[in-house]
Amino acid sequence: MSWFSDHGVELKIEDDGRVFPVSNSSSSIIDCLMSQAMKIGVSLQTGKVVTTASASSLGKFLLKIEKRTIDYVEYVEADYLLIASGSSPQGYRLVAQLNHSIVDPVPSLFTFKIEDPKLAELAGVTFPKVKAKLKLENVRRNIPQLTQVGPMLVTHWGLSGPVVLRLSAWGARDLFSLGYEGILIVDFTPDLNMEDVKSILSQHKLQFVKQKVLNSCPSEFGLVKRFWKYILNRESLVEDMLWASISNNSLNSVASLLKHCSFRVTGKGQFKDEFVTAGGVPLSEISLNTMESKIHSHLYFAGEVLNVDGITGGYNFQNAWSGGYIAGTSIGELARVTDLEERVL
């Protein structure tokens, strides 16, 4: 973080620990990185693909490079090779060619598809703080991280926001095996216990007996009118009912729904909107202090090509940058020492 601040990109930390540029624009990060790369003479070649990679008996790496648009082939011999190809299938193919194993990649950090037409009508409604628990069939082990607290957003196809993205990250592999089906239980009043919610509803009923229930939602809940209407509809309460006509049983049912509102997850976001991938090169096959392969000397990995995936909020970027920094400095130091030794000889 200090590196970006020192290079002109101011950062901010959200209440839930997520880190973003103050500009709220990813281009601030991209422009900073590109600017620094150009300053130190990095050669950036685009429109090319490394199609094959092999290790020679002399400790070199033989690379076949092709252009995407024309019939062009180039062969390069490299002293060092750093694979930082993200979740690109081509990157995984290079990994396999170099005899590394791959943990099957699955999507992570995605939104939840909820087939609920009434919920879809609320697209754009945000909740600053909810407590959400993801229940997955046949997953009996206790996974504390499948309960998360944070902001949530209603979309045209379901639910999104930091709390949902974190749940998708912790449940990525189980969700994949279950066809992205499960039950999401949301507490819309996480700072109030059940008895508090019941008491607030009862007091509100006494205070606003002659008002329509739709037009008078307890302010303590912090809910927008559109969502309050959704809650009432789920409890089959007629919108023009007066508070005076609502039974205590109905009040208890509303309280239960606010504290334990269940949604059936039927898939992940419809636009292939996952941000990262879980899976990749096992960490057991690299030396984390240098990011060097344990199979081939002078072969390095960094970023999402490794079996590492973080929650939302900058953690995956940090993993890529930290791993890239370690790998780059390791290569630089090794090359410097090798150069000195060759000069001595």
Say what each PLM segment does.
Residues 1-2, 6-17, 64-66, 80, ...:
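Residue-level recognition of phosphate/Mg2+-coordinating polar/acidic sites
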Residues 16-35, 45, 84-86, 90, ...:
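Short beta-strand to alpha-helix junction loop
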Residues 46-61:
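A conserved short coil-to-beta-strand element within the FAD-binding core of flavoproteins
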Residues 50, 74-87, 94-96, 152-155, ...:
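Short hydrophobic core segments
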